[in-house]
Regions:
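Acidic, low-complexity terminal tails and accessory targeting/binding regions
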Residues: 1-3, 48, 78, 82, ...
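Beta-strand elements within well-structured catalytic alpha/beta cores of enzymes
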Residues: 4-8, 58, 141-147, 151
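Short, solvent-exposed loop/turn segments at secondary-structure junctions
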Residues: 11-14, 62-64, 87-88, 149-152, ...
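Generic structural signal for well-ordered alpha-helical scaffold segments
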Residues: 43-47, 129-137
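Phosphate-handling substructures
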Residues: 14, 28-33, 74-129, 180-184
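Glycine-rich phosphate-binding loop signature in dinucleotide/nucleotide-binding domains
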Residues: 50-53, 135-141
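Active-site-proximal alpha-helix that buttresses catalytic centers in soluble enzyme cores
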Residues: 2-3, 8-80
Length: 209
């Protein structure tokens, strides 16, 4: 049975001043809601034909992901199933000042690079891949998953070559460029098609109208 999985980045979050916030940086990140603009982006960009007749909807546990997923849930009259393992990469720091210089570049080039308490590229990829494989064990044919930009890129690197080009990068699957740019836009959608043995056979970059 062919299965279609739509990987969707969350919409635009709200920026707030956390100087007096006693929560850990990780909890602050997980609690970050969508901005008004983010709500409007999600409402518009997720109301497309590709995201109709979804059998099962998943989201990370982050507030901005669930808040994005609710538009797909409403359009399809289905519930949101929360899975923690679709969450974003964990930095493992207490303040942004602790993040090493050129952290993103170093982690991109070395799959095992991480802070002492954070996650490596490889760990994020394995975590999200295992979660996806568990989802594919079910009989649902059309699945939507809302999660996060870096986690999505690291997951795609399971099957794709990612080649830097100055400040942008190419994501290549089976010698076809499926993405070229600096980052995934808010509500970016990739359609992954799996065969009856849960082997990935195609990746499509879904364009918004």
């Amino acid at each position: 049975m062919i299965k279609e999985v739509y990987l969707i980045r969350h919409s635009k979050p709200l920026k707030v001043n956390n100087d007096k916030n006693m929560d850990s940086l990780q909890i602050q990140n997980e609690k970050q809601p969508l901005s008004i603009e983010g709500e409007n982006i999600a409402r518009e960009k997720l109301n497309i034909k590709e995201l109709k007749d979804i059998d099962k909807l998943y989201s990370s546990s982050y507030v901005r992901a669930i808040s994005t997923a609710k538009y797909i849930a409403e359009n399809n009259n289905i519930e949101i199933n929360v899975i923690n393992d679709f969450g974003e990469r964990k930095f493992g720091i207490n303040s942004w000042d602790e993040l090493p210089d050129n952290f993103g570049e170093k982690q991109f080039l070395d799959e095992n690079y991480k802070t002492e308490f954070g996650e490596s590229q490889k760990e994020v990829r394995e975590r999200t891949f295992n979660a996806l494989m568990n989802v594919l064990k079910n009989d649902d044919k059309k699945i939507a998953i809302v999660f996060h930009s870096t986690a999505m890129l690291f997951l795609l690197m399971t099957w794709c070559k990612v080649i830097p080009d100055k400040d942008k990068y190419n994501v290549i699957f089976n010698n076809n460029i499926v993405f070229y740019g600096k980052y995934f836009d808010y509500c970016k959608i990739f359609k992954l098609t799996f065969n009856d043995k849960n082997k990935l056979i195609n990746i499509e970059n879904i364009k918004h109208d």
